[in-house]
Amino acid sequence: VSLNVHRHTSILHFNEAISKQAAALIRISLVSTGQASVLLSSEPELEGILTLLSASEGIDWSKVTLFCLSDFLGVSRSSRLSMQNDLHRKLLAQNPAISTKALINGESVPSSEVTRLSFLINQQTIDLALLSPGETGALGLLESASSEISTIDGYSLCEPSDSIRKSFVQPNRFKSINEVPQRGITLSTKSILRAKNILCCLEGNKKSALLNLLDDGVITDAPIGALKKHPALHIHLGPSISVNPAAS
């Protein structure tokens, strides 16, 4: 399988190219169906992309529904500790008309919230998934493509590993792993792959090795590896990603 790989020499070009492609895909959906559903992950490298996307012209945001890949239980989605906080700061604050009914409510009854979210996403066609994997190849809180929760339709409760939880010990977020919640809600790989279009964004020195996991000859259990099955996958590489020639 030949991968659609886009290399960018600057962060500015990285952010601009991805936001323009995302905006174009949203516009196409709005023209063809009158609505658009967008799935977003919450890695830091999406912040600049979301800022530019929020200012894109020609998008009626009142007809756009947002879904989030994962979030922790017991955390308000508007809190700085929430995985959805970047969506609030970078996208929703600028476009309050966006439908937020499908965002994760980590303060709700967990089993009821999973049922609610799964019903909503299974009723929709996800037009665009804008994703940025974690350093281990995880997608949100989902870290194994072969786990039971990765094969269901919709969302599930999950217990992220210590390695996943450590990745959220960051300035302005959690000060130590002991503060990071031990349970969350995450979307299955099966549901992610139902998206019409997937933009996979890689940036940061620690993520260079992830490109190899997208190579067709590499077997991996990391969820990022499942994305290579998708016929409309586009991989965007930031300037700090070292490229393996075999993956070109």
Where are these regions (language model features)?
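Short glycine-rich anion-binding loops that position phosphate/pyrophosphate groups of nucleotides
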Residues: P44-E45, P133-A138, S144, N205, ...
